């Protein structure tokens, strides 16, 4: 099984061009699967049948696996068994009759406009790290980028003259996202004045640097945003993704085209973008209930 799993992971990385984060999720799912099979003395892929898979799923449910995680797990092992059958590592695909559980998508937290403004105005612009943080927050809200995308940004990915940023998303897919005047102003000062002071003796091309002149980490950005959220007295779960959700929702609330928002977010499936239209409708319902005398 180990050999087939490694072959499969190599296949999806090379042929499908999936990101390291996605590959890691697949690897974790397959480890759970392999561990369960080994615990139950199943040593060969052709010994796996539908009943064994259902028992494995029951075990994961008993362990507290959410329906969303379970759906992803089933998707992973289904893809794995299809690969094994296609490459003749196995004589059958035992996942054929396994159904994927439906799960309700949770509506994401979204900041109100005044909360966004309060967050953006929190960093101390007289300090290098404060100016960096303001620029980063402005860019996150202006573009809806994922945290993994912003830490991968190099200086050369930002075109201040043309007013756009080149983003490499999931599966290393490239997209171009426009920049507004405000974020261009912050980026210009940051790149020309602040970043050289943070760079110190290093030669990295990463756009956003920590105080040691190295690229900011994912965890570092999460901590920065959480810290400013507390200072701004925002009583919501605040993550880099909250700014992405807010970017999309505010665009749609102001009449932006759904396809254009899909393109800027880098969603391969428009149904993912449509989730934000439900957020907008829920806000309308909340406002109606609060202010209409007969609600």
UniProtKB/Swiss-Prot annotation:
Main location: cytoplasm
Any one cellular-component term (Gene Ontology): cytoplasm
Domain Tyr recombinase: 106-289
InterPro entries: CB (IPR044068), DNA_brk_join_enz (IPR011010), Integrase-like_cat_sf (IPR013762), Integrase_catalytic (IPR002104), Integrase_recombinase_N (IPR010998), Integrase_SAM-like_N (IPR004107), Recomb_XerD (IPR011932), Tyrosine_recombinase_XerC/XerD (IPR023009)
All residue ranges annotated as the Core-binding (CB) domain in the record: 1-85
Cell compartments where the protein resides: Cytoplasm
Domain of life: Bacteria
Keyword terms of this UniProt record: Cell cycle, Cell division, Chromosome partition, Cytoplasm, DNA integration, DNA recombination, DNA-binding
GO biological process terms held by the UniProt record: cell division; chromosome segregation; DNA transposition
A Pfam family this chain is assigned to: Phage_int_SAM_1
Active site feature: 146, 170, 241, 244, 267, 276 (o-(3'-phospho-dna)-tyrosine intermediate)
The protein's role, per its UniProt record: Site-specific tyrosine recombinase, which acts by catalyzing the cutting and rejoining of the recombining DNA molecules. The XerC-XerD complex is essential to convert dimers of the bacterial chromosome into monomers to permit their segregation at cell division. It also contributes to the segregational stability of plasmids.
PANTHER family hit by this protein: PHAGE INTEGRASE-RELATED, TYROSINE RECOMBINASE XERC
Protein name, UniProt field: Tyrosine recombinase XerD
Species per Swiss-Prot/TrEMBL record: Staphylococcus epidermidis (strain ATCC 12228 / FDA PCI 1200)
């Amino acid at each position: 099984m180990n050999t087939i799993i490694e072959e499969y992971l190599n296949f999806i990385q090379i042929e499908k061009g999936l990101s390291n984060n996605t590959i890691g999720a697949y690897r974790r799912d397959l480890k759970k699967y392999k561990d369960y099979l080994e615990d139950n003395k199943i040593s060969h892929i052709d010994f796996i049948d539908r009943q064994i898979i259902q028992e494995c799923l029951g075990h994961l449910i008993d362990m507290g696996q959410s329906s969303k995680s379970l759906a992803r797990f089933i998707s992973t092992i289904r893809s794995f068994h299809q690969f094994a059958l296609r490459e003749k590592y196995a004589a059958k695909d035992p996942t054929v009759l396994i159904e994927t559980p439906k799960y309700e998508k949770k509506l994401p937290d979204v900041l109100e406009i005044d909360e966004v403004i309060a967050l953006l105005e929190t960093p101390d612009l007289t300090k290098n790290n404060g100016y960096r943080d303001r620029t980063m927050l402005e860019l996150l809200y202006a573009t809806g980028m994922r945290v993994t995308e912003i830490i991968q940004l190099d200086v050369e990915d930002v075109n201040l003259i043309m007013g756009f940023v080149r983003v490499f998303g999931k599966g290393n897919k490239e997209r171009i996202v426009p920049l507004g005047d405000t974020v261009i102003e912050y980026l210009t000062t940051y790149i020309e004045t602040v970043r050289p002071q943070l760079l110190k003796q290093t030669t990295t091309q990463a756009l956003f640097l920590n105080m040691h002149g190295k690229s900011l980490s994912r965890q570092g950005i999460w901590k920065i945003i959480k810290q400013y959220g507390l200072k701004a007295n925002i009583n919501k779960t605040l993550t880099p993704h909250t700014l992405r959700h807010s970017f999309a929702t505010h665009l749609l609330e102001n009449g932006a085209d759904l396809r254009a928002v899909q393109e800027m977010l880098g969603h391969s499936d428009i149904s993912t973008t449509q989730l934000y239209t439900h957020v907008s409708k829920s806000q309308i319902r909340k406002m109606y209930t609060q202010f209409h005398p007969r609600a």
